[in-house]
Design a protein with these regions (language model features):
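Conserved, mostly hydrophobic/aromatic
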Residues: 20, 71, 266
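A short acidic, helix-capping loop that chelates divalent metal ions and anchors anionic groups
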Residues: 38-43, 107, 127-134, 195-199, ...
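Accessory C-terminal segments flanking Radical SAM cores
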Residues: 195-308
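Radical SAM/AdoMet-radical enzyme domain recognition
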Residues: 50-71, 75-189
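Canonical Radical SAM [4Fe-4S] cluster-binding loop centered on the CxxxCxxC motif
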Residues: 8-50, 64
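Glycine-centered loop/turn positions within well-structured domains
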Residues: 26, 128-129, 252, 278
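A detector for short, charged/polar N-terminal pre-domain segments
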Residues: 2-8
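Pocket-edge positions in alpha/beta enzyme catalytic cores
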Residues: 8, 45-48, 74, 135, ...
């Protein structure tokens, strides 16, 4: 299939990130402002139905020949029709279905049977007190149990850790060893200059350089070539363990990003950090209009991440 939607840098959309809901059962400090924490406990957001999501995904797949769908949130496991949705996506013929989750209520075996191939699990601390300070919830053990369940279900598992100076940078090597012992690839994420952190993220910013310095003080490490469109750069230890760093600020991957975002209202965004929604719910039976709006979304892509309020 010839993709009619390509920009001057050769970028196109091959991965669809679907934000199933804005709600979450955690209130992590890099995601939720302290003034909003109490609101997250009883917040229930209306989302698209499974039928609507599948109709949109089928239309986008027809135009873009998508390779991957990644289900995100908020927390995607809060979406009540998650398993039927995954089953429906599998039936569209899209090659890979992935998910990013905190794994606190993970139905791993049924998700695997429905068609989920891999899961990135957010884990920002091993020590319970640090985990609570970040997430404002006592759910560390549920996440650790979720990691075990995902591995038992033979899902491909990765761990995502947002590293924050003065908050959980003292957890970095503990998390590294936890992942290494289980042969799970861990990716350390730089804090992003987004949302309420736009004007003051430097206070807790812990750079790729600092992450590499911390790990290389304990292991001999070698950088690997970055795959095209990959979010992370990877290194290996001298005994063959592979880990990654997502350098959202130091070295963003915008120049060959192939991701399209779909939110829970039926809007698309060409840049994951963009604040300007483009609705496609009103034109799902009009392929030419879909293409025009996808071209508009592609024009939102930056050549370098610059933050977003």
């Amino acid at each position: 299939m010839t993709n009619p939607i390509t920009d001057e840098f050769g970028r196109s959309f091959k991965t669809l990130r679907v934000s199933l809901t804005n709600t979450c059962n955690l209130a992590c400090s890099y995601c939720v402002d302290a003034s909003e924490i109490k609101q997250t406990k009883n917040l229930h957001q209306k989302t698209l139905t499974t039928k609507q999501y599948l109709e949109i995904i089928q239309v986008l797949h027809k135009v873009l020949d998508l390779e991957t769908v990644r289900l995100t949130g908020g927390e995607p496991t809060l979406y009540k029709e998650l398993i039927p949705l995954i089953n429906g996506i599998k039936n569209t013929g899209i090659e890979e279905i992935k998910m990013t989750s905190n794994a606190t209520q993970l139905d791993a075996f049924n998700l695997k049977n429905a068609g989920l191939a891999s899961i990135n699990i957010s884990l920002d601390a091993i020590d319970a007190d640090v985990s609570f300070d970040i997430s404002k919830r006592n759910k560390l053990q549920q996440t650790l149990s979720g990691i075990d369940k995902a591995m038992e279900a033979n899902l491909q598992v990765k761990i995502n850790t947002v590293v924050m100076k003065g908050v959980n940078d003292n957890q970095l090597m503990k998390l590294f060893e936890f992942a290494k012992e289980r042969n799970i690839s861990i990716r350390f994420l730089e804090l992003m200059q987004m949302g309420f952190l736009y004007h003051n993220f430097q206070q807790h910013f812990f750079s790729e350089e600092e992450i590499v310095k911390t790990i290389s003080a304990n292991y001999e490490i070698t950088p690997l070539d970055r795959d095209a469109s990959a979010t992370a750069k990877y290194w290996t230890t001298n005994d063959g363990y592979k880990f990654g760093i997502i350098s959202n600020e130091s070295d963003p991957f915008c120049n060959d990003c192939n991701r399209l975002r779909l939110d829970s209202y039926g809007n698309i965004y060409g840049c994951l950090s963009d604040n300007y929604p483009i609705s496609i719910l009103d034109c799902l039976d009009d392929e030419q209009t879909i293409i025009e709006r996808l071209v508009k979304a592609l024009a939102q892509k930056k050549t370098k991440f610059s933050g977003s309020e």
